[in-house]
Amino acid sequence: MSDGLDVIVLDDDPGISQVLKELIETFYSWGEVVCFSKAEKAIDYCLKRDTGVAIFVVDVFLKDMSGFFFLDSIENKFPSVHEDAIMISGKASEDVVDMCLASNVTYLLEKPIKPYALQLAVRSITAKYLNFAKKLLRDPALAQSISSL
């Protein structure tokens, strides 16, 4: 586990999971990119992490559970998991869009994934954390108040 902002990829197809990992690694340098094809292994990994911040790329329809159930299962460790998730689906129906809206998930990409769309979604989530880090660097009092939490 790195000290950076990692990307965690979960797709029940190991080939797709690996391709997404490799694609993200071509443009992402702020942390590690790890991939899983089994939801339970991804949950175990996430719950054992030291930090509760990451970017998630998750398939909507997994074999053992829905991608939304996966997000819900790690929400105590990752309070912003829904806002930091990019959901992917082979068929982005109105029901899937409604589930994203109900879960506070902003990003939904349809397979086959367009590399630029994935890059923009990942960069958008990354920018949120980079902007917050800049605020902490410019405001020592804010940084001190947060560190005491």
Where are these regions (language model features)?
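Two-component/phosphorelay signaling modules centered on CheY-like receiver
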Residues: 14-36
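Acidic, metal-coordinating helix/loop segments flanking the phosphotransfer/catalytic sites
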Residues: 35-55
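Acidic catalytic/metal-coordinating carboxylates
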Residues: 38, 66-69
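Short amphipathic alpha-helix used as the core "switch/output" element in two-component signaling
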Residues: 44, 68-81
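Alpha4 helix (beta4-alpha4-beta5 surface) of REC/receiver domains from two-component response regulators
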Residues: 69, 82, 92-107
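C-terminal output helix
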Residues: 113-122
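CheY-like receiver
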Residues: 123, 127-149
